[in-house]
Regions:
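Post-signal-peptide N-terminal segment of Sec-exported extracytoplasmic proteins
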Residues: 38-79
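An amphipathic alpha-helical core segment
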Residues: 147, 151-192
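A cross-kingdom marker for long, charged
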Residues: 193-226
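C-terminal motif of bacterial Sec signal peptides marking the signal peptidase cleavage site
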Residues: 18-22
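Bacterial N-terminal signal peptides that target proteins for export
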Residues: 1-9
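Mid-length scaffold segments of soluble, non-membrane domains
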Residues: 91-155
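A glycine-rich, hydrophobic loop/mini-helix early in the fold
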Residues: 64-96, 100
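Bacterial signal peptide processing site
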Residues: 24-27
């Protein structure tokens, strides 16, 4: 065998080895992403199932933890006035409104999960537990707010939440002071906005909790995509 033949054969073996490694890496990357997506979709399903049930929504600590400061201030003021029952009614109205956001939230989140890339996976490996949810939040939070806020606003208007709160506060304009608005539309929009924020952030809290519970599975599946 002459020198040229040996050189060509060596190059062929090297090329074959590189191609094989690339195929293995590609296949492993696909498997790792599939595992990641499956876990995130599981977290989304878990969260939206909670949103679908008023009592589950009310009882969930991760959703309660997402309550914006403005609504905390409203509730604190009502409680100081001895209106605990009204605080509970407000929470129930928000929980009922949440059930109407499930159908618009699901496709937004599902599409975002299905569009995750190997670059996203590499960032998750570097960032550790919770990073996948953070990426999902970056991709979808604005879109979710835009999609669910009108539904929340319509339901809270239907329930007459603002007028109920204003009547309870006897025209003192405390609600306007707390929410930074004066008109009825501003007050309704304020409560709807903050309720929508609670829903979006509460949903991501649930997804992140699910991700963290499955952190070792995710990391093991993505280690080959570093």
């Amino acid at each position: 065998m002459n020198r040229n033949t040996i050189l060509v054969a060596t190059m062929a073996v090297a090329t074959l080895g590189t191609t094989t490694q690339s195929c293995v890496a590609l296949a492993t990357s696909s498997v790792g992403l599939a595992v990641l997506k499956q876990i995130l979709l599981g977290g989304i399903t878990k969260g939206l199932n909670i949103f679908s049930d008023k009592n589950s929504f009310l009882a969930n600590e991760l959703i309660e933890a997402a309550l914006p400061q403005q609504l905390k201030d409203v509730n604190s003021t009502l409680q100081k006035l001895g209106l605990n029952s009204l605080v509970q009614k407000e929470k129930e109205y928000i929980a009922q409104a949440a059930t109407f956001t499930v159908d618009v939230s699901r496709p937004i989140l599902t599409n975002a999960v299905n569009s995750l890339t190997a670059e996203d996976a590499a960032r998750i490996v570097q960032g550790g537990s919770g990073t996948a949810t953070q990426i999902l939040k970056e991709k979808t939070s604005e879109q979710l707010m835009a999609a669910i806020a009108p539904k929340v606003d319509a339901k809270l208007n239907e329930f007459g939440l603002v007028s109920t709160l204003n009547n309870a506060l006897a025209g003192s304009n405390l609600l306007g002071t707390l929410l930074g608005g004066q008109s009825s539309n501003a007050l309704t929009g304020g409560i709807s906005k903050f309720a929508s924020q609670q829903m979006v952030n509460g949903l991501f809290n649930i997804i992140q909790s699910h991700e963290q519970q499955n952190a070792s599975t995710i990391m093991n599946s993505l280690n080959s995509i570093k």
